[in-house]
């Protein structure tokens, strides 16, 4: 029964029924009013207020939990769940690392936290500005955490907020309902330490690479590095910053020598040396081939049409992102001295 739709009656039919059963007009009105409010209450109880089911989580190490997302672009089928997210539990509180692509996913992540621990969420850390990592932030507002990100995060989010929201609503429709950008309340410039209670986390910002606001989280206790999108596994790396800077950052990440790695996209806790080397090889060949195209006097379109064609079968989402990567690399390297 639709509560938003009126129901037609024959003229005088309610009066006739009332007379048949001897019901007074006043009692009849009260009875219909009670039934109406009862139906409204029922609709509210069984309606869209139901809690999101918790995200599935994988324990990477004691106290470290991550969700393996879909290797895809955001669609209604995957509900925008396309970036790995998770949380770290200390003795005092919890740090959430990235929150997913919608408010609904953020709520599901919060439910997953509550399945594991009753401890409060004291930090929500965003590894960078991209929408698949940040739109779940609003699910944690009532926990009153510090929202933590690079010192460059707020400006980067503000510059694209309108476009991100428009694209989210276009691709996901009502699945995206309530999603909004919640910016940082605490920023990191260089490095910072957060303590969850017997669990120090080292946060570090990087030079422009995947974006200009990349941030990693290293858990000293378990040796787990959350790379954000500085590491893509199986999915093609996406250049929204600097291919040169990214290659330099990869060299520094290797020197950290973590025991476990949670990448921004792809399988959790992969053989990280092999994964970084595959990403490094792609980016190095991209930069080298684009430099050669520029040296030959090729236009940007000619470079897009010819560079990196041999990479097609090596990476998921190649057809969507590789040509964009060539364009970004050309624009960066064209003015290289």
What are these regions (language model features)?
Residues 47-51:
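Sec/Tat signal peptide C-region and signal peptidase I cleavage site
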Residues 111-187, 191-193:
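Active-site HxH/HxHxD metal-binding segment of metal-dependent hydrolases
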Residues 52-60, 155-206, 211-212, 220-221, ...:
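Metallo-beta-lactamase
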Residues 61-112, 215-227:
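Conserved beta-strand hairpin/beta-sheet module of binuclear metal-dependent hydrolase folds
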